[in-house]
Amino acid sequence: MAQTAWKFAQTGANWTNSNNIAADDDAYATVSLGAGAYSSPLIAKNFGFTTSDVPNGATIDGIEFRVRWRRLYGYAVGVHYASMRLSWGGSDGDSKAAQVTAISNSETSFVLGGVSDKWNVSVLSTADGDDEVRSAEFGLFFRIYNADAKYSLEVGIDSVECRVSYTAPATTTTTTTTTTTTTTTTTTTTTTTTTTTTTT
């Protein structure tokens, strides 16, 4: 199994300053939500994977997303949900939901998925799986539920990264052997000289 490097999403949508997710630089994509409310989904996509990262014919083994975030306002109680975005739009596969008992007011990070987790997305198990992760539309839907029944919540996401685990395609090596035969012919020429003597 091989792994790509972590790569930042270059495109974000639906939150305030959504494209701030493209670097770990303390510039945040932000969302505010009332008590007991869901946020709109942050769409993180366009990770820039190429055939240099995931070769043609590779088998996708797992997908991971790493999110850096912090609480900007409100109390720490919340639940975050995530699902995978596919190239034809929308979301698909397992929803990754996790209870967050303390969204820190200092930046922290967490990882969704794993090296053998394909999020129950069937296309990743087909021959088109490598094309899918290289698509600019491939990515993550991420939203938050504010579990506090009284106070609003504001959250900032600094960056979203993706890493792909894969098995490289089998390679076929063809060896050509050329044999050269050299034949040497030796010709021997024998010359006979006859001398005749006449007596008178």
Spell out what each predicted region is:
Residues 1-171:
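Disulfide-rich extracellular domains of secreted proteins
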Residues 171-200:
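Extracellular mucin-like PTS domains
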